[in-house]
């Protein structure tokens, strides 16, 4: 079993990575004690992994909430549903919430854990590649709003992340490709060697090779854990993890969270960020082409025809990185060298949107 740590002083926590962890009672006993547990999952994941998880957690009192699957259900109403169950079952402040699922379940459950009695323990058990490499780590929790993605949320770190790599064996190919977008992002922001490794080993990843997947999960978590440890609240370096996400979140919200998986929208957003970096004279043309080729090989969209540039720009205007009325973007100087800036020419953004939308 691989163990990484997110170093946050007294709130530090482990990321455990191995096959079969959901079925190991010792993993949960060590970190959750004997407290009451509320498990939140969805209609896709629960039939596959909920029985094994509940068996590992016995003999605690366990209550379950099963949500519909999909980004469209990451809502304040469903978070309220989780809170209603906690209150109805008289859960105390010593309870724990466990998120069993992908990014939607993890974000929503984390938000409920942050809200309930001003914060209770949270364990993340991510079952998708995207959640395992990104959303389960770092303490960002949120629900969506019709006006924008993740506009309602809180920072609330888990006490434990249990990454059972065996869950990837049941992951649909589309979900696997979506998760690779976040892995590609890590290479782009700070690890050119990882990006080169992805170019060389992408076929293994797409085929679901366990060793290749374990490698990218560990490396992605190493990068994110280090960044979160240095900048938990995203006042500086952590903003780099949003490469492609300002574009991607706008694409998701502009299409009502129904058209694209989050990772697919991020893939298109990474293509747009690379293209805009080239438009601004920052990123060499051959490197921008490498980014686009890798995204295309991964089966990720590099443009979105179903939404207009004006609609995307409107949704970008409510992004959380807007400061003083100015939209900040994460751009690239090179593969492995990202930076946050509000100093870019508006025509470059307009050309980028026109080339990738509509």
Please annotate each region the language model reported:
Residues 2-4, 181-183, 282-358:
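C-terminal charged capping/lid subdomain of soluble metabolic enzymes
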Residues 104-111, 132-133, 249-250:
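Short glycine/serine/threonine-rich phosphate/pyrophosphate-binding segments
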Residues 1-96:
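ATP/NTP phosphate-donor binding region
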């Amino acid at each position: 079993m691989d163990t990484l740590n997110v170093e946050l002083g007294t709130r530090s926590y482990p990321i455990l990575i191995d096959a079969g962890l959901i079925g190991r009672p010792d993993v949960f006993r060590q970190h959750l004690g004997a407290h009451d547990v509320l498990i939140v999952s969805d209609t896709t994941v629960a039939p596959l992994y909920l029985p094994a998880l509940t068996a590992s957690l016995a003999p605690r009192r366990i209550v379950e909430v099963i949500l519909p699957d999909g980004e469209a259900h990451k809502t304040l109403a469903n978070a309220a549903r989780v809170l209603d169950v906690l209150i109805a079952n008289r859960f105390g402040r010593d309870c724990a919430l466990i998120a069993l699922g992908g990014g939607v379940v993890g974000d929503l459950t984390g938000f409920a854990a942050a809200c309930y009695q001003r914060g209770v323990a949270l364990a993340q058990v991510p079952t998708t590649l995207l959640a395992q490499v990104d959303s389960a780590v770092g303490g960002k929790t949120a629900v969506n709003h019709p006006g924008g993605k993740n506009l309602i949320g809180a920072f609330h770190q888990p006490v434990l992340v249990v990454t059972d790599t065996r869950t990837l064996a049941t992951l649909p190919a589309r979900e696997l490709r979506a998760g690779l977008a976040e892995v590609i992002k890590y290479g782009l922001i700070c690890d050119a060697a990882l990006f080169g490794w992805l170019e060389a080993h992408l076929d293994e990843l797409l085929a679901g090779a366990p060793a290749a997947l374990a490698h990218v999960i560990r490396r992605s978590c190493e990068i994110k854990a280090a960044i979160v440890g240095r900048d938990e609240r995203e006042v500086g370096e952590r903003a780099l993890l949003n490469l492609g996400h300002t574009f991607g979140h706008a694409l998701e919200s502009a299409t009502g969270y129904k058209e694209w998986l989050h990772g697919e929208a991020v893939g298109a957003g990474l293509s747009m960020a690379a293209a805009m970096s080239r438009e601004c004279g920052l990123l060499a043309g051959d490197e921008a082409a490498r980014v686009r080729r890798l995204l295309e090989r991964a089966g990720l969209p590099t443009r979105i025809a179903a939404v207009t540039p004006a609609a995307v720009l409107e949704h970008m205007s409510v992004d959380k990185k807007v400061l003083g009325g100015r939209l900040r973007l994460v751009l690239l100087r090179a593969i492995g060298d990202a930076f946050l800036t509000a100093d870019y020419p508006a025509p470059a953004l307009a050309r980028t949107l026109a080339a990738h939308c509509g």
